[in-house]
């Protein structure tokens, strides 16, 4: 079964890359039109992650919503020292971008999670949604600020060390 998933993921890799690129380009164009500075990264999920999720959720490959995943990281035009842990100046932009995503692509009901208003216990913050992408394929989209991304990737302790060191630390 694992090798079947591996083969299915490998067989659909180029199509998934193409679909992700279509969504990324459409979003990039709209964000530029609205002068929102953001990094948009798309990635097809690795087969082992897909297999684990299928097992855990008892779903088929086609039923998963995050086989195609895109992350939008909003960059601040504000001074980085201004960004305090609970005072991220770009938080509102996350919701603006979410509205834009839902205007560009049909949202999938029940697939929106607001971890900004309700952070996870480890202080993870992000907006998650799933939308109907090209060819009717579901696409998971995560939206967060650069500060939220840093906390998500490196943890809250690393975020504070980064803030204390200023811009001299590259993370």
Language model feature labels by segment:
Residues 1-171:
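Nucleic-acid processing machinery
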């Amino acid at each position: 079964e694992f090798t079947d998933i591996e083969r299915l993921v490998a067989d659909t890799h180029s199509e998934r890359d193409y679909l992700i690129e279509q969504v990324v380009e459409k979003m990039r164009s709209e964000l530029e039109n609205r002068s929102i500075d953001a990094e948009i990264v798309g990635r097809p999920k690795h087969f082992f992650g897909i297999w684990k999720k299928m097992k855990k959720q008892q779903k088929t490959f086609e039923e998963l919503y995050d086989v195609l995943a895109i992350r939008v990281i909003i960059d601040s035009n504000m001074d980085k020292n201004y960004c305090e842990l609970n005072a991220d100046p770009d938080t509102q932009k996350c919701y603006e971008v979410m509205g834009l995503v839902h205007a560009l692509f049909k949202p999938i009901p029940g697939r929106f999670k607001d971890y900004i208003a309700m952070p996870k216990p480890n202080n993870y913050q992000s907006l998650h949604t799933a939308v109907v992408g090209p060819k009717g394929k579901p696409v998971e989209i995560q939206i967060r600020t650069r500060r939220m991304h840093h906390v998500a990737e490196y943890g809250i302790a690393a975020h504070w060390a980064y803030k204390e060191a200023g811009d001299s630390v590259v993370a």
